Curated annotation (Swiss-Prot):
Protein's name in the database: DNA/RNA-binding protein Alba
Gene Ontology annotations of biological process type: chromosome condensation
GO cellular component labels: chromosome; cytoplasm
Source organism phylogeny: Archaea, Thermoproteota, Thermoprotei, Desulfurococcales, Desulfurococcaceae
Species: Ignicoccus hospitalis (strain KIN4/I / DSM 18386 / JCM 14125)
SUPFAM superfamilies registered for this protein in UniProt: AlbA-like
Length: 97
């Protein structure tokens, strides 16, 4: 699968520390974005949840809410040809009006 370019309202969570993703989310919100999608796969799912909770409870309490949570899985083919499934999560944060 070819890597896709993230959209301007998207934060993709990976191996970096949680605070990097919190800062990216806060930066997007400060730029005026009203809906942000935080996406993660596999082991990074817990980091995505931590990111959302830190933004909601520590930095912007009462100012953002979780609008939607989507879970799923993707089939990935390894270098030796085996297929495996990887869990995914998309959390949509939106500004409270």
């Amino acid at each position: 699968m070819a890597a896709q370019i993230p959209q301007s309202n998207e934060v993709r969570v990976g191996k970096k520390p949680v605070m990097n993703y919190v800062l990216a989310t806060l930066t997007l919100l400060n730029q005026g974005v009203d809906r942000i999608e935080i996406k993660a796969r596999g082991r990074a799912i817990s980091k995505a949840v931590d990111t959302v909770e830190i933004v909601r409870n520590r930095f912007l309490p009462g100012q953002v809410r979780v609008a939607e949570i989507r879970i799923g899985s993707q089939t990935v083919t390894s270098a030796d040809g085996r297929q495996s499934r990887i869990s995914t999560i998309d959390i949509v944060l939106e500004r409270v009006k």
